[in-house]
């Protein structure tokens, strides 16, 4: 959806607060300063609101602010992968169960996957503050996303997957660290 850039007029119409972060690039096109974390957050909020019907998305300032288009692409790749074993038809609906390891405060994969395809998500994280933020986003938007805490960092699946659980897909980002060390 965003390969040709962003429709800032449309996004500002939906989220007027984004306008304060818009600038003109050297060729006169409207954009934002992608080095400005506040601008990226506001763009993410506008994209989620306009394209995915997520009316509240606010994460703590010390948390990763994921670029929405890349996360959307990942969900579409997974949909294409699921279609390979479903007569080339992308499966939709809550009968498709997805497990997001490291869902984070932004809970972005479950938000987009549920909005685009109606899939049922379970998000897992080790950080209680991230899960609290994710829970607030889910509650405010009236979304049924199951959130679970992984208490032992070394265990990725053990302790969060219950004996009755079945998942069609598991997704994650690489681990994020506070520094390069």
PLM feature segments, named:
Residues 120-126:
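Conserved SAM-binding motif I beta-strand of class I
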Residues 91-104, 122:
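Conserved class I S-adenosyl-L-methionine
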Residues 80, 111, 115, 136-140:
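Short, well-ordered alpha-helices that flank and scaffold nucleotide-derived cofactor binding pockets
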Residues 1-65, 80:
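N-terminal auxiliary segments of SAM/dcSAM-dependent transferases
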Residues 105-119:
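Conserved SAM-binding loop of SAM-dependent methyltransferases across substrates and taxa
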Residues 64, 69-70, 103-107:
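Gly/Ser/Thr-rich loops at beta-strand to alpha-helix junctions
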Residues 46-51, 69-97:
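Conserved alpha-helix/loop element of class I SAM-dependent methyltransferases that forms part
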């Amino acid at each position: 959806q965003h390969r040709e850039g962003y429709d800032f007029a449309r996004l500002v119409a939906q989220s007027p607060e984004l306008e304060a972060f818009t600038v003109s690039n050297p060729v006169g096109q409207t954009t934002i300063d992608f080095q400005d974390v506040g601008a990226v957050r506001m763009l993410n909020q506008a994209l989620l609101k306009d394209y995915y019907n997520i009316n509240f998305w606010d994460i703590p300032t010390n948390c990763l602010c994921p670029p929405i288009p890349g996360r959307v692409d990942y969900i579409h790749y997974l949909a294409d992968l699921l279609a390979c074993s479903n007569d080339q038809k992308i499966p939709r609906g809550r009968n498709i169960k997805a497990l997001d390891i490291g869902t984070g405060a932004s809970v972005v994969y479950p938000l987009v996957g549920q909005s685009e395809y109606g899939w049922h998500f379970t998000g897992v994280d080790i950080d209680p503050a991230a899960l609290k933020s994710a829970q607030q986003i889910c509650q405010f938007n009236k979304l049924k996303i199951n959130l679970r805490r992984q208490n032992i960092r070394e265990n990725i699946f053990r302790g969060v997957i219950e004996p009755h659980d079945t998942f069609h897909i598991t997704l994650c980002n690489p681990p994020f660290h506070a520094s390069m060390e």
